[in-house]
Every structure is written in structure tokens, then in C-alpha cells.
Amino acid sequence: MSSSQVVRDSAKKLVNLLEKYPKDRIHHLVSFRDVQIARFRRVAGLPNVDDKGKSIKEKKPSLDEIKSIINRTSGPLGLNKEMLTKIQNKMVDEKFTEESINEQIRALSTIMNNKFRNYYDIGDKLYKPAGNPQYYQRLINAVDGKKKESLFTAMRTVLFGK
């Protein structure tokens, strides 16, 4: 089996593992999971899909197309040569090996298995400090959207710290 085929197979394993990775509870502009899936789907030779499983046709040019445009032309869109060289130097050229992808698979699986959370267990002394034992629970409830504070309880928390 050629090395590129081995890299593709490893990237497919990584994409499958990333698809099992839970979505962020707090929605950001860019999700780690989504960015990594799109990145390694390209390496694995798989088509990009949206949340519903439909294939996405890429409207944007790929990184290789941009590089070829820059290499073929002396000054596209009125850019001077200095600017082009700066752009070329900043572009990331990812060359994956089987070993590097397997390292990523190992790292992601340890994160998903909560290996270090279990290894470095934090006791109740940190989660429920003596001065304000409900502090972290109140934050977690606010993030999850379970229990909202009223204006009175919010003012009490600000004034008295509890």
C-alpha cells in the first residue's frame, strides 16, 4: 500500500473519530469539531458534508488553486511582488504523514475518554469553596440555561457575594 493511501486511511479514521466528538454546548463562530472535520476530509479524499449529511459544493477556491494562481501570475489583482511573497510565506502547506495523523488520533481519543480529567481528579474542595459553595453550580446552570437568576437574586449576589 502506498504512503498516500495509508495517510488517507488514517485520515478517514480521524474523521470518524471527530464525528463522534460532541458538539460545543456554547456556539461559537467557528467550531473546533467542524473545522477539523473539514480539514481532514480533504486529506482523506472525502466530500464535505453539512449537518444534515448533504454534500457541500465548495464555492471557494482551494488552497492549491490559490497557490497555483499566485505562482502563475506576477501580480494578480494589482498586488505587487513584495505582497505576493509575504502571502506565499504565510500560507500553510500541510504535509501529513501516517505518524502525525496517528498522533492526532491518540490525542483526540484521550480527550474524548477524559483520561486527564480522571487522572487529575479535582475534589469538592475546589468545586464548592467554603466562602461561596453555590458559585460554580450557579455558573453551570447559567451556561446550561436551567435556572435563571431574577433581578433581586442578581443584585443580592452583587452586593453580598452570595
From Swiss-Prot:
Keywords: Acetylation, Mitochondrion, mRNA processing, Phosphoprotein. It comes from the Eukaryota. GO terms for cellular component: Cbp3p-Cbp6 complex; mitochondrial matrix; mitochondrial ribosome; mitochondrion. GO terms for molecular function: ribosome binding. The keyword Phosphoprotein applies. It holds the Pfam family UQCC2_CBP6. The modification N-acetylserine is found at S2. The modification Phosphothreonine is found at T97. Its main location: mitochondrion. It is found in: Mitochondrion. GO terms for biological process: mitochondrial respiratory chain complex III assembly; mRNA processing; positive regulation of mitochondrial translation; protein stabilization. The keyword Transcription does not apply. Present with 2130 molecules/cell in log phase SD medium. PANTHER family: CYTOCHROME B PRE-MRNA-PROCESSING PROTEIN 6. This protein is involved in processing of the 5' terminus and the intervening sequences of cytochrome b pre-mRNA. This is Cytochrome B pre-mRNA-processing protein 6. It comes from Saccharomyces cerevisiae (strain ATCC 204508 / S288c) (Baker's yeast). The gene is CBP6.
